[in-house]
């Protein structure tokens, strides 16, 4: 593990966005583990700006998100699929068929198996973005 100390949240977001950029440039078919919530939004904005500037190409990238709310469809404004579309996917040149957010409706056990398969399909994520909450939680747990 590498620990990087920064002076501000904005600097932290810039460092993280640059880590993602460097990975994608080096490995255009990178697999990204992504997160939802407030923490990653500024990072996503920086990645969008890089894509819009033509310095970052998401066309070969694959993504996996690790959670979704049960009982709501991906078009619901509280779903994580909706969050990812609104905050990142709709603004970059990624093939949405290469993005995975677990289903919130249907057979939850089958959905969990599908999520597990996607996590390991083609190897684990090359990089994983997770938030740390003010109460110490990591990711959504």
Features from the language model and the residues they span:
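Ligand-binding beta-strand-loop-alpha-helix segment within the catalytic cores
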Residues: 56-128
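Glycine-rich N-terminal segment of FAD-binding domains in flavoprotein oxidoreductases
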Residues: 26-51
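Electropositive phosphate-/nucleotide-binding environments in soluble metabolic enzymes
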Residues: 6, 10, 14, 41, ...
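Generic structural signal for well-ordered alpha-helical scaffold segments
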Residues: 17-25, 48, 52, 85-89, ...
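Class I SAM-dependent methyltransferase SAM-binding "motif I" and its flanking Rossmann-like core
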Residues: 135, 139-141
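N-terminal glycine-/serine-/threonine-rich phosphate-binding loop
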Residues: 1-32
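Redox-cofactor binding/interface segments in oxidoreductases and associated redox assembly factors
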Residues: 34, 128-130
């Amino acid at each position: 593990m590498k620990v990087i100390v920064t002076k501000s949240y904005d600097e932290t977001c810039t460092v993280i966005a640059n880590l993602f950029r460097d990975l994608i440039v080096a490995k255009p078919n990178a697999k990204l583990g992504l997160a939802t919530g407030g923490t990653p939004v500024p990072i996503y904005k920086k990645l969008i700006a890089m894509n819009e500037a033509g310095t970052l190409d998401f066309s070969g990238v694959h993504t996996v998100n690790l959670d979704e709310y049960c009982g709501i469809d991906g078009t619901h404004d509280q779903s994580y699929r909706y969050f990812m579309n609104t905050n990142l996917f709709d603004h970059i040149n990624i093939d949405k068929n290469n993005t995975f957010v677990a289903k919130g409706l249907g057979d939850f056990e089958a959905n969990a198996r599908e999520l597990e398969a996607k996590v390991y399909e083609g190897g684990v994520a090359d990089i994983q973005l997770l938030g740390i909450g003010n109460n110490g939680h990591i990711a959504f747990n």
